[in-house]
């Protein structure tokens, strides 16, 4: 009886105490992007053992609080409604007849183990870079655990000009991006490749970008922000191309 009373009390506490409730993701920013950023935007899917991306910031400047890395791997972060309220953020640089288009996606948590997780963290931000020369994508780079893998265009599955990229759990480790298989079908609720509402670096609402790039996402970090952008381009740059990340 005491156990039952304790369980009932805990349930009531979770319902009645606002701090115990799951925070809803911020409202997405309206899509606002350059034609080039949109042309090369990745076509995304998200494996079932992880979260959907959500906005990192709202139009009013409210920053995502994320989720504790506990419970199910996709717990509280894989609702169909998340696909209808999400953003991707982009920034580009061109020189020496090459352009790099970098895309950031934010996820509320990154969890390696179901239940109590020792190795993941609140917040995850992953990145894709599309390398373009001669108005054709020549390489694609995907982020994983702070590093990049870079692939020839012939190794990449495409939907038009959009590389197909999947957010997945990397074995026993946490989540990252990978290339989609040539015949891979999307696993998200809609069963189609997803294009989160895109916001280019110079198209954020007034003041919102400054709040976003100053936000603390723990071990996760935006690659589009000053101080990180050139570093990420340098880490992922295909060998032998004349592109200068610091120009």
Predicted feature residues:
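Residue(s) in the substrate-gating loop at a strand-loop-helix junction
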Residues: 130
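Short edge-strand/loop segments of extracellular domains
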Residues: 133-135
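A domain-level signal for the mature, folded cores of soluble proteins
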Residues: 22-126, 139-247
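Secretory targeting and sorting signals
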Residues: 1-23
